[in-house]
Swiss-Prot record:
One of its GO terms (molecular function) is gluconate transmembrane transporter activity. The chain crosses the membrane at residues 78-98. This is Uncharacterized protein HI_0094. It comes from Haemophilus influenzae (strain ATCC 51907 / DSM 11121 / KW20 / Rd). It is found in: Membrane. InterPro entries: Glcn_transporter (IPR003474).
Amino acid sequence: MSELLINDYTRKGFVDGLCLRLPTICIRPGKPNKATSSFVSSIIREPLHGETSICPVAEKMAFSFIKFLGKKKEEWALAITGYVVSIPIVLPILIIFIKAILDLGK
């Protein structure tokens, strides 16, 4: 709702707005569903059920993508996305989750 309001007010020139979408992790019960589940929730859900989980994203992949974009590309990114920017999950935080789960399993 607030995103629509900010976009509309920005379009009309009332404000110079920008919306940031923060990533959330919602662990759903039951088996993963391709439409609603992500690998991040699987990394937390499967170990809770005593199952093995696999992280399909390499640690270097996110950093190489950021390096590919380069510095000072904010204007280019805003031109493509408009006034809504989805912030990607921070990979080091995901690695901390994985290490904590592995430590609990020892």
